[in-house]
Amino acid sequence: MALSAAIVLAAGEGTRMRSNKPKVLHAFAGKTFLNRVMDSVAALNPDTLAVVVHFQAERVAEAARSYDEQVTIVNQDDIPGTGRAVQCAMAQLTEAGKVDGPVLIAASDMPLLDSETLHRLVEFHTASGNGATVLTTILDDPTGYGRIIRDSEGNVLRIVEQKDANSSELAVREVNT
C-alpha cells in the first residue's frame, strides 16, 4: 500500500477548550495531540506528510517542523471548515505534483487513533476501489459527533454535524471518527 500523502488537519482553534494554546498543542499522556496523530500517520510511510494550519499558524507549524523537518505546511485561508482545510491541502499538494495515489486525511484532535487502524483503513480503501473511504464507528451515545448519513445501499451520502442535524439524523448512532 503506497500512500502518496497524509494530511493532518490542525487548523482549528479548539474554542471549547477555552485555552490560549491551540487544541493540537495540548499534551495527552506526554505528547501533544499533533505529535500523536503525526506518529500514527507517519508509521504508514506516506510519500508526503502535510499539516494544515490556521489558528496560531506559526506556532503549530513550528511544532510540526520540530516533529519532521520535511513536513509540508499548508496554510488554510480564512474560509472555515474541515472541507475547506482539505481543499487547501489538496490544491497545494496537487500543484506541487505530490498527489499521484491515495491520500489519507486525519484530524489532529484524535490522539487515540493508532497506526494499525489507519493501516487497515487504507488497505480496505485500496481493496475496495472506493473514491473515498470514511472511518466510522457506532456509539451508544453519539452526542457531539457528526452523523453518517447513508443511502439505502449503504453508501455514505454526507456527514451532518450535530448542530445541523434534524431529528431523524440525530437518531443515527454511526459517527465519523
Model-derived features: where do they sit?
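N-terminal nucleotide-binding beta1-loop-alpha1 segment
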Residues: 1-19, 49
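Short alpha-helical oligomerization interface
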Residues: 20-30
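Conserved N-terminal catalytic core of the sugar/cofactor nucleotidyltransferase
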Residues: 2-5, 31-123, 150
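Glycine-centered loop/turn positions within well-structured domains
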Residues: 15, 23, 58
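Conserved beta-strand scaffold positions in the cores of enzyme catalytic domains, especially
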Residues: 25, 73, 132-134
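Conserved core of the sugar-phosphate nucleotidyltransferase
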Residues: 58, 113-177
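Conserved beta-strand segments of alpha/beta enzyme cores
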Residues: 24, 70-72, 155
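Short beta-strand/turn micro-motifs composed of small residues
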Residues: 10, 53, 107, 136-137
